[in-house]
Amino acid sequence: VTSYSEIRKDAESISRWNMNHPNENPQISFLERTISNNEIPVVAVSDYIKMVPNQISSYIKNPFYVLGTDGFGRSDTREGLRKFFEIDRYYIVLNSLKALVDRGNLQKSVIKKAMDKYNIDSEKPDPINS
């Protein structure tokens, strides 16, 4: 996503148009056109606070998971920031697997295997509280 706020504006605009034109065929937002399968979990990630990707949550019917950088980081690089706040590629994979486990598509053991493979410490302090 290049701009969560632009996607939200599109969805809000379409929603408003549909409300104001009840006798016409409803328009479909970009989100509805691109994420139309209600079975597939969506993992939305941002280098900003979770509220940034969360602003589109009401327009997504799919199971929705959000990763963001809530709190204060101790990072001098973007890569360090993503690792500290658990939003790097490894945590995106981990959250995607968790979403599939939650839906019953995978066994829980897959999560542990991924954590081992990517050296994810289950006892790492929560970045929001550290």
Model-derived features with residue positions:
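Thiamine diphosphate
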Residues: 1-130
